Amino acid sequence: THPTATLHMANGSKIVIELLPEAAPNTVNSFIYAASRGFMDHHAIQRIVPGNWVDVTYQAFGHKECQYLIPNEFELHPEIEPLDSHPGCVCMGGYGEDGLASCEFFFPLRDCPDHKGIYPVFGKVIEGMDEIWRLEKVKTRPVDFPIPGVEVNEPVEPEVIEKVELDLKGQTYPEPIRMKVQNLPPCWTDMR
């Protein structure tokens, strides 16, 4: 049985994610590392792109401890066939050759064949898709973002993840393998 992560939202709803260690082992380890230490708790979702995705954070949850990059999953595990990315999946964001974000996960709102093998699917939503579809429709406002060509809109009324509750089914998960060279993205710089 797979580990699960339950996102308890401030509005009382919850999103339950089944984590898929066999599909993206190091990515799952990194998510568990951040979630188990409470770094995702009391976090307002930072970016919503209707018709594309809900980005939970682009600042590593505002914690220096989460400001690290991990190797692309295909480099660590070329033998694993990556899963297709579509609504109902949970994917890890990344910064190209610099690596994947430690814990900057997102929910696709459409089929994303161009993401396959780049932004790994490391979980699937087993409860609470209605909450994700609700998030797609909330009122947003633009915010300044330091990466050219990337438009960022945040909810006008904060949509807060109160707490992430893990059920690791009695298993232990190691700390993630990190990139040897940490070329941190510009959207993290204002926090260092």
Regions picked out by a protein language model, each given a short descriptive name:
Residues 1-192:
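Cyclophilin-like peptidyl-prolyl cis-trans isomerases
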